[in-house]
């Protein structure tokens, strides 16, 4: 007898595969995220993987983006400045304490010539973080924590740019302390 809920089964399989791919990418990078390893960890066949994803790169990228995007949480009922600091520090920890840093550098480089990767980075990594940060900025403006004339879009770029600058160029150490210092300098300007 067939599964009475095939859509649920499909969602469960996709979830298991993406979880496995994300874990493998964070544990050992793209080299660890082979189709065999993903299938074994997810408990599915390689054929099932190819049913939903055209390549190892596609499933690994989607799994990594999903895992990386869920790697942060914010303090509850905290001032906007504190939550913004935690958001940026969480990204720095991910980049410096897991293989995500070198992976993200490679993905950003590849995104310059591969639209699929650029879209995945924007949709699954940047936009979710920017949306959370934008809401925090708006809350800070509404509560009087930040200046009323704040340009949210420009501030979002200022918030994250120092992290990506150090991640991509490596001219100085990227560390949680650097992120905290950078954010605190920015917050001083936001308060006016």
Segment roles from a protein language model:
Residues 62, 72-104, 155:
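Hydrophobic alpha-helical connector segments
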Residues 102, 116-142:
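Amphipathic alpha-helical packing segments from all-alpha helical-bundle domains
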Residues 17, 32, 55-60, 70-71, ...:
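Short amphipathic alpha-helical segment with a characteristic S/N-K-E followed by hydrophobic residues
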Residues 138, 147-169, 179-186:
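Hydrophobic alpha-helical segments that form the core
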Residues 43-53:
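Short hydrophobic/aromatic patch on the recognition helix
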Residues 1-41, 58:
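Basic, helix-initiating cap at the start of DNA-binding domains
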Residues 52-53, 121, 125, 164-165:
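Tryptophan-centric aromatic hotspots in well-structured domains and transmembrane helices
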Residues 63-64, 96-120:
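Amphipathic alpha-helical segments used for helix-helix packing
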């Amino acid at each position: 007898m067939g599964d009475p809920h095939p859509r649920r089964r499909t969602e469960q399989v996709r979830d298991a595969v993406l979880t496995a791919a994300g874990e493998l990418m964070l544990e050992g990078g793209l080299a660890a995220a082979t189709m065999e390893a993903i299938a074994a960890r997810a408990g599915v066949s390689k054929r099932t993987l190819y049913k939903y994803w055209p390549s190892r790169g596609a499933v690994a990228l989607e799994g990594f983006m999903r895992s990386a995007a869920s790697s942060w949480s914010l303090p509850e009922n905290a001032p906007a400045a504190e939550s913004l600091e935690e958001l940026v520090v969480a990204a720095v920890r991910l980049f410096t304490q897991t293989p995500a840093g070198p992976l993200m550098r490679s993905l950003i480089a590849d995104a310059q010539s591969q639209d699929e990767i650029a879209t995945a980075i924007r949709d699954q990594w940047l936009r979710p973080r920017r949306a959370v940060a934008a809401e925090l900025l708006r809350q800070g403006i509404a509560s009087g924590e930040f200046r009323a004339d704040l340009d949210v879009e420009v501030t979002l770029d200022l918030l994250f740019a120092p992290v990506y600058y150090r991640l991509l160029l490596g001219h100085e150490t990227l560390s949680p302390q650097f992120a905290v210092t950078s954010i605190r300098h920015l917050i001083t300007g936001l308060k006016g």
